[in-house]
Amino acid sequence: MNKHKVSIICPIYNEEKYIARCIESMLGQDYPSDDMEILFVDGMSTDRTRDIVSDYTAKYNHIKLIDNPQHTVPYALNEGIRRSEGDVVMRIDGHCIYPDNYVSTLTRYLHELGADNVGAVWNTVAARDTTVCHAIAIASSHPFGVGGSKHKIGVKEITTTDTVPFGCYRREVFDKIGLFDTDLTRNQDDEFNARLTNHGGSIYLIPQLVINYTARDTIGKMCRMYFQYGLFKPLVNKKLGHPATIRQFFPMLFLLGIIIGGILSCFSDIILWMYAAVLALHMFIGMAIGCKSAARLKRPLLVVMMPYVFANIHLSYGYGYLAGIYKIVMNKKFNVKSNR
């Protein structure tokens, strides 16, 4: 009999393509089901997600379906935490497949390390076996696309970090610092983990544990996601009272550089050459990554697809970040519905 009761919370919305395999990976855990509860908090899905989950709730007593009429992730997390009973609270995502030792390993290290939050390495996989989907998955996990987050590029040893995907928390963390910020449709985990470390909490990345996360399956969905990430980042910084890092400005500066540089290049040959050089460098880096990926996956079109996908990520995030700054300066509301 395990000592710790684990409450697993999964915010979901229109996940009919992926939710069954997520649930099956949870049912395959080597942690006793008597010591687990799995709470699927649904944002009132309009596809078959609720029917699929309901089929499982009818068969397994430790699986429950909870309504989230507010739709967004932070509301789902908070409702799940309030309804949960475990002394360990674990968040998962319906787009992921988890190794069978996921729950047991995170629970063990949470207590062995004396940590407040622990998490696994995030391996991004293609939604479908197409060139576009592979390009999205590669760009969404490459440092050139998304920066050098430890949980995305991986580490060799257990290490402290500023955030982990999803997370496994001690329940007392929420009693100490509160719940997730419902203003943050995106980036609520970044804000929460920063709040946790500001209160002296510790977060560890467990590198031997890898989860497979399914990337967005279209360029449009990918752009919407990165726009929202960029949009809410300035609000996170404002709430935490933290200055923005230089790296956060790069996509916005890239966007402004394309717009302003394109205009100014009409009046100066020097600016035109500088403008062309920056665009060429960005394209060259994307093509170089594309060449390596094309050889590995035997998909030659990745050579031209990767620069396109990288550019869309950077421009979408940059546009979102610029819009986020505008909303803060103009005191506008951040009304965005999170969806796939």
Predicted regions located by residue number:
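Conserved donor NDP-sugar-binding/catalytic core segment of glycosyltransferases
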Residues: 101-134, 138, 209-210, 214
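Catalytic donor/gating beta->alpha subdomain of glycosyltransferases that bind UDP-sugars
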Residues: 126, 175, 181-244
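Short aromatic/hydrophobic "clamp" motif used to bind/position activated sugar donors
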Residues: 89
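A conserved acidic beta->alpha catalytic loop
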Residues: 42-51, 70, 93-99
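Glycine-rich, basic loop-to-helix element that forms the pyrophosphate-binding segment
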Residues: 68-84, 105, 164
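N-proximal low-complexity "stem/linker" segments adjacent to membrane-targeting elements
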Residues: 1-28
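Membrane-embedded multi-pass helical conduit in multi-pass membrane proteins
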Residues: 254-329
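Cell-envelope/extracellular polymer assembly enzymes that use nucleotide-activated donors
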Residues: 4-7, 37, 191
